[in-house]
Amino acid sequence: MESPLGSDLARLVRIWRALIDHRLKPLELTQTHWVTLHNIHQLPPDQSQIQLAKAIGIEQPSLVRTLDQLEDKGLISRQTCASDRRAKRIKLTEKAEPLIAEMEEVIHKTRGEILAGISSEEIELLIKLVAKLEHNIMELHSHD
């Protein structure tokens, strides 16, 4: 019988995020909010909403709702792009900086605890294998 690898990977991502979600509860961030803030922080400055949606792997309308909420909380700002008035550039605000620092610390610490007992060579191999799987899936999508 074949291993349900896809289901295993989906479950792993779900429980990994659930653990971080639980640990970030004191910061009053939903999973959607912290995933979005984390991606904004990780990407180069002044990303567009389109680039951010691609990085997170969600549709733009879903992202817009989240960005509206983060903007209402004063954590991000959006400016119209000078070269394309339809595009919006996203920036973290000063108010977001201490929250991002605390959030990133929790994420980094949790990642370290999750990967405890796994060698750096094993982690590198896993990263390469996941990249190959992603490449294969993207190739299949391009042919369909």
UniProtKB/Swiss-Prot annotation:
Residues 49-72 bind DNA. This is Transcriptional regulator SlyA. Transcription regulator that can specifically activate or repress expression of target genes. Required to activate expression of virulent genes. It comes from the Bacteria. InterPro entries: HTH_MarR-typ, MarR/SlyA-like, Tscrpt_reg_MarR-type_CS, Tscrpt_reg_SlyA, WH-like_DNA-bd_sf, WH_DNA-bd_sf. One of its GO terms (biological process) is response to stress. The keyword Nucleotide-binding does not apply. It comes from Salmonella choleraesuis (strain SC-B67). GO terms for molecular function: DNA binding; DNA-binding transcription factor activity. Keywords: Activator, DNA-binding, Repressor, Transcription, Transcription regulation, Virulence. Homodimer. PANTHER family: TRANSCRIPTIONAL REGULATOR SLYA (PTHR33164:SF64), TRANSCRIPTIONAL REGULATOR, MARR FAMILY (PTHR33164).
